[in-house]
Amino acid sequence: MVKNKLKEIRMTKYMMNSNEFCKLIGIKANTYSQLETQKQQGNIETILKISKALNLKVEDIWYLED
């Protein structure tokens, strides 16, 4: 299963609430909520957009859980 570290990144690196973080990365709050809670994996466009906004590699945010 694909997992992400969005909440960890938001809380430790940016110290923002989710609404502020959504504005920073340029996605809708409901989309972000679905991603952060692992209810949705996101499409490739959204994944790349977030990666670019955070200046991180995709694999630094998303990973395969063993």
Please tell me what each predicted stretch does.
Residues 6, 21, 32-35, 61:
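Conserved hydrophobic/aromatic packing and binding residues within compact polymer-binding modules
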Residues 60-66:
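Short amphipathic recognition helices of helix-turn-helix/homeodomain-type DNA-binding modules
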Residues 4-24:
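Short basic helix-loop element that most often maps to the first helix and adjoining turn
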Residues 45-60:
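DNA major-groove recognition helix of helix-turn-helix/homeodomain DNA-binding modules
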Residues 26-41:
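Recognition helix of helix-turn-helix/homeodomain-like DNA-binding domains
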